[in-house]
């Protein structure tokens, strides 16, 4: 059973400070924001954390040393540390040239055109061909390219060596599966230096068949349902539903509704994620007795 707390945009040194409370609240996993070097370390735009220049570790969220210290301390509390890994795309050049890689992007990637997907934007999310072969508003990486795979595997193993217990694969739905001609997920997940207790990929608005295919390689973070509830991680709210201008459908929901719905999820699903609402007074709701009670109750069969 996994009770995951997403402390989005929270510095690692603060996550470390919160570990006693996280443990007391019944969370056994904490998810931290992407740590890859991004095109700017500005705190004004949260989405810039999802515009990495490559796979070098260290940004305003924290350093390698701070991550190592966090993992070491979390182990004392029996808490897994999960890092959000941006593996589908890199930073863009500008808002106008949004499918062009930023000039400071990893040089080896820039010098190999085959490292990138075709410069076409997804316009129909119901078209699987577009979802896996086009871009989602940023320069998409070619998951079948051996250079791309090696760089991602090297980064993930560097995280593993620092003590990380798992990963969230951002935009996993846009990375093709073996039956679609792509060996990315088996290659990457089977190349880690050690077994990890929790790896999950973001696959939103998906049918049961697609979820089951991704679940062969990892758990699936989703707002959809599945026949095998142990294969998925459910949430009421995430960063996109709260912060995004286009997808922010939970922004107007009161914290009482979020907590109520989370309690219902936790009663029926073995794996759940609670998003701490950053930049607001509601951020502290994850510390409420209601959330604690939901996490510590047994899941109904």
Residue locations for each model-derived region?
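N-terminal structural segment of carbohydrate-active enzymes
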Residues: 1-83, 88-92, 98, 127-143, ...
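Active-site-proximal helices and loops of the catalytic beta/alpha 8
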Residues: 3, 17-23, 34-36, 41-50, ...
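Residue-level preference for long, well-ordered alpha-helices that form the structural scaffold
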Residues: 59, 63, 144-148, 177, ...
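Glycan-binding loop/region signatures in secreted carbohydrate-active enzymes
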Residues: 91-150, 229-236, 243, 263, ...
